[in-house]
């Protein structure tokens, strides 16, 4: 899917993705199968209040949270399985592993520009409520995290995305 998005971005134009539509559908199917077996984690957990309160589509809400969650993972545990992800991304995106996640965030922004949460109607006073809600209601997902995230961590992530 990354190589297809890279190609579509390089070709430009709003219809460039259509050349890879079947690949995107296949990748989405595989992702669904993988999620069913491995589960999801903080990105999805933190997306739920955004969709529930502000009706942000779940996929877009995931995109809004992804980079900041990953940065928090890197901050809390820079050495570990995250390095395997960096190696895989580096090979696909043609960049050194140390820059791989940033290259992914840039590609994601090229596909769909990430807007701050405030531009989706989220207010700053909602952020602590969302963080608390995620801790209280999404332990099934949070249990799959790369590292444990506290309510304070979640609030920090929401604030970064705000």
Predicted features by range, described:
Residues 53-126:
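Gly/Pro-rich interdomain helix-loop hinge
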Residues 24-32, 46, 66, 104, ...:
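Short alpha-helical scaffolding segments that buttress acidic/His motifs in well-ordered protein cores
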Residues 1-38, 146:
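Carboxylate- and glycine-rich phosphate/diphosphate-binding segment that chelates Mg2+/Mn2+
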Residues 1-2, 43-47, 82-86, 108-113, ...:
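Short acidic (Asp/Glu) and glycine-rich catalytic loops that position anionic groups and cofactors
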Residues 126-162:
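Short, amphipathic C-terminal "tail helix"
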Residues 30-59, 139-141:
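Glycine-rich phosphate/pyrophosphate-binding beta-alpha loops
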Residues 20-23, 42, 61-65, 81, ...:
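Residue-level detector of well-ordered alpha-helical segments, enriched
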Residues 2-7, 29-30, 52, 67-74:
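Short glycine/serine- and small hydrophobic-enriched flexible loop segments
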């Amino acid at each position: 899917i990354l190589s297809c998005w890279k190609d579509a971005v390089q070709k430009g134009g709003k219809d460039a993705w259509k050349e890879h539509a079947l690949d995107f559908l296949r990748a989405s199917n595989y992702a669904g199968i993988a999620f069913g077996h491995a589960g999801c984690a903080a990105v999805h957990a933190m997306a739920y209040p955004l969709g529930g309160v502000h009706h942000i589509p779940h996929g877009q809400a995931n995109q809004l949270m992804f980079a900041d969650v990953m940065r928090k993972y890197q901050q809390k545990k820079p050495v570990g399985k995250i390095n395997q992800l960096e190696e895989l991304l580096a090979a696909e995106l043609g960049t050194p592993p140390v820059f791989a996640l940033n290259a992914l965030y840039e590609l994601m922004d090229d596909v769909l520009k990430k807007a701050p949460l405030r531009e989706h109607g989220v207010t700053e006073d909602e952020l602590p409520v969302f963080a608390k809600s995620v801790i209280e209601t999404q332990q099934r997902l949070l249990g799959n995290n790369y590292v444990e995230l506290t309510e304070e961590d979640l609030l920090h992530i929401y604030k970064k995305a705000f």
